[in-house]
Amino acid sequence: MAKKTKKTEEITKKFGDERWKALDDALKNIGKDFGKGAVMRLGERAEEKVQVMSSGSLALDIALGAGGYPKGRIIEIYGPESSGKTTVALHAVAQTQKEGGIAAFIDAEHALDPAYAAALGVNIDELLLSQPDSGEQGLEIACKLIDSGAVDLVVVDSVAALVPRAEIDGDIGDSHVGLQARMMSQAMRKLSASINKTKTIAIFINQLREKVGIMFGNPETTPGGRALKFYAYVALDVRGNTQIKGTGDKKDQNVGKETKIKVVKNKVAPPFKEAFVEIMYGEGISQTGELVKIASDIGIIQKAGAWFSYNGEKIGQGSENAKKYLADHPEIFAEIDHKVRVHYGLIELDEDDVVEDTQVEDTSDELILDLDSTIEIEE
């Protein structure tokens, strides 16, 4: 029988034990018919905090608030052409594989570059790739992969390229009003429960379109109807900003671009936070670059003039040399990355971190004692 609380005792006084007995019988019957856990008290759930997986970008993890993409949820990434949407998604694929998971990529645009994916850290030998003939086929493949429970991440690139079969079979110029929106709406209804149950992360990349005749307000919209907007737990707006000039022999060349990623929807943490990353051509997001900037902003890496220092040791003159130092010393990179994540509350404190704080306090006490003893001697 269910454990009684103060409120349940009051109900029992009013209506007797029959009401609780009827509820217990109903819960048992529901469990038999639909399986254990079909109905439960919210406090009985083992997991209260949403599990996350790193996005592969420290700046984006901080902007997301929880430290990465929530597991068992739908993510939408949209933005203008060549803004870095696929790059952001491929970093998530690389991170999934790095953590020992399995990732699948539904390439509806038929435009995935294996060499570029490999440069971003994706193990292309282990990546599951599908290039579907129609939108229904692509979504059905994604559904079967998610239902299997064996895949940790599914990326669909892109929603705009998921063309309904009726449109493919028809002639150019035929009207197919609402076909794609109905297809996406049906897919979201079918996928959402399965995604949550299997704790799979589903990333849908989307393009931008403009509404005709809009004089006021934002004319931009995304294809595929409103279903994805409703079902998405997190939505990211990716926009490329200024070009990054090279140094040395490449000083006249553009080697990358500064990109702004805005969290326009977030059900895990407060939305509308922004992450600024450097996407280097042929390399992806500069993880050393964002670490140098963030760590120096919060004082973990010290900056004096053009020099960057860590723990009293100079690591480079200028940001480029500091980035090179961190790339050549992965153990230092991991140590600084850990401290930054602890600072922003993305991960819990380790015992080592607590010990370090204790040591600092003890040292300060010793200094105070020494100062007092000195004063006594002078008197």
Swiss-Prot record:
One of its GO terms (biological process) is DNA recombination. It comes from the Bacteria. Keywords: ATP-binding, Cytoplasm, DNA damage, DNA recombination, DNA repair, DNA-binding, Nucleotide-binding, SOS response. GO terms for molecular function: ATP binding; ATP hydrolysis activity; ATP-dependent DNA damage sensor activity; damaged DNA binding; single-stranded DNA binding. One of its GO terms (cellular component) is cytosol. The keyword DNA repair applies. Gene3D superfamilies: P-loop containing nucleotide triphosphate hydrolases. Its main location: cytoplasm. Pfam families: RecA, RecA_C. It is found in: Cytoplasm. ATP binds at residues 79-86. InterPro entries: AAA+_ATPase, DNA_recomb/repair_RecA, P-loop_NTPase, RecA-like_C, RecA-like_N, RecA_ATP-bd, RecA_C_sf, RecA_monomer-monomer_interface. Belongs to the RecA family. This is Protein RecA. It comes from Streptococcus thermophilus.
